[in-house]
Amino acid sequence: MIPGEYQLKSGDIELCVGRKSITINVANKGDRPVQVGSHYHFAESNPALSFDREQAYGYRLAIAAGLAIRFEPGQTREVSLIPYSGLRRLYGFRGEVMGPLDNKPKQESV
């Protein structure tokens, strides 16, 4: 082995094998591009993005870690989402969860 050498297995690496996923359509209704990272809570993404946020609650993009998807102004695209796993606690982002995902607050009707 050479110091710093990579020894990789042959074949493809499959992401999200066996994970439940959903597919939603997302439209950028804004006038600027919006980029969403791989581990961002999709329901809390930029308000210029139009999609079913209720359906996306507790989900993130089903893409490799460190990647992002860019939505150009006026663009509509289909994305796959997978649920957060582990303790399913979120803090930060836009501050809409700040704790366990499974204790989702009820939406107030107006």
UniProtKB/Swiss-Prot annotation:
GO molecular function: urease activity
Broad class of enzyme this protein falls into: hydrolase
Database matches in HAMAP family: Urease_beta
One record GO biological process: urea catabolic process
Annotated Pfam families: Urease_beta
Record note on quaternary structure: Heterotrimer of UreA (gamma), UreB (beta) and UreC (alpha) subunits. Three heterotrimers associate to form the active enzyme.
Record-given protein name: Urease subunit beta
A GO CC term assigned to this protein in UniProt: urease complex
Pathway recorded for this protein: Nitrogen metabolism; urea degradation; CO(2) and NH(3) from urea (urease route): step 1/1
EC number: 3.5.1.5
Organism: Pseudoalteromonas translucida (strain TAC 125)
Family: Belongs to the urease beta subunit family.
Compartments in which it is found: Cytoplasm
Catalysed conversion reaction: urea + 2 H2O + H(+) = hydrogencarbonate + 2 NH4(+)
Keywords assigned by UniProt, alphabetized: Cytoplasm, Hydrolase
